[in-house]
Amino acid sequence: MTQESLLLLDRIDSDDSYASLRNDQEFWEPLARRALEELGLPVPPVLRVPGESTNPVLVGEPDPVIKLFGEHWCGPESLASESEAYAVLADAPVPVPRLLGRGELRPGTGAWPWPYLVMSRMTGTTWRSAMDGTTDRNALLALARELGRVLGRLHRVPLTGNTVLTPHSEVFPELLRERRAATVEDHRGWGYLSPRLLDRLEDWLPDVDTLLAGREPRFVHGDLHGTNIFVDLAATEVTGIVDFTDVYAGDSRYSLVQLHLNAFRGDREILAALLDGAQWKRTEDFARELLAFTFLHDFEVFEETPLDLSGFTDPEELAQFLWGPPDTAPGA
């Protein structure tokens, strides 16, 4: 790759320019090849952008994965979190990528250096592909139980990091406080829920300190959506969990929000199987607490949920509809 190609990075000088180029195959492929060459790693014949993502990601055939971090869209924070997560997970009993190397595309120039990580590629297919591609309900539920076991092991990983993933980190509770202050107006703008329900939400939502009281911090992956989990449905195996830019020392209940509403698409029978595999006791307040975490989550969590929620006016009924046992009547 020539110096001219590196200079193309100067085109990314704002959130808008980053957004328009972040998943551009033609733009990133030569840069990813340069990254592998600089690390002395084999350069595969094929590098492709697997789909839409927050950070530029290219996947090699058959290996590896290259992930680049810009200065926009929380890139510096994402790099710090992901780097810390890989250090913490290095010997953990969970299927995660191996970190093969790291570097910068243009170090020491005074401009943004464009750091990158190179990781091993996960085998299997994404959870989303497996769920969409099977009619074997029992196999899918068995896989959800296995995912629950893996999730339980992830939550028990010791918090040995130095910033975000430490037992006394305040990043997670501060995030929840910020979300509590903003969530009602955000949901008004997103439009998935009725104004009458949102009018009641401020009084219904618990105080963050009350919600977290007595909870031991755990390793929490906050973005377990349908393409961040890799599986082998036929073998009932979870083959990989990826993307550690949204990790916290926090409350394990938070990790269920994207998992259920995005990956499971709100299917409560699949959620019940996962909880069974994780040996997660469903308390009397489970649905109410999980709806609270739904509203405190950092993402637009209903975006991929194929459920019409607009008829609900009572948060308690919405809690049971989304998070109650699978035999609970909808109530809307």
UniProtKB/Swiss-Prot annotation:
GO terms for biological process: response to antibiotic. It catalyses: hygromycin B + ATP = 7''-O-phosphohygromycin B + ADP + H(+). GO terms for molecular function: ATP binding; hygromycin-B 7''-O-phosphotransferase activity. The active site is at D223. Gene3D superfamilies: 3.90.1200.10. SUPFAM superfamilies: Protein kinase-like (PK-like). Signal peptide: none annotated. Keywords: Antibiotic resistance, ATP-binding, Kinase, Nucleotide-binding, Transferase. The keyword Nucleotide-binding applies. It comes from the Bacteria. InterPro entries: AGP_Transferase, Aminoglycoside_PTrfase, Hygromycin-B_Kinase, Kinase-like_dom_sf. Pfam families: APH (PF01636). Its EC number is 2.7.1.119. The keyword Cell division does not apply. The aminoglycoside phosphotransferases achieve inactivation of their antibiotic substrates by phosphorylation. Belongs to the aminoglycoside phosphotransferase family. This is Hygromycin-B 7''-O-kinase. It comes from Streptomyces hygroscopicus.
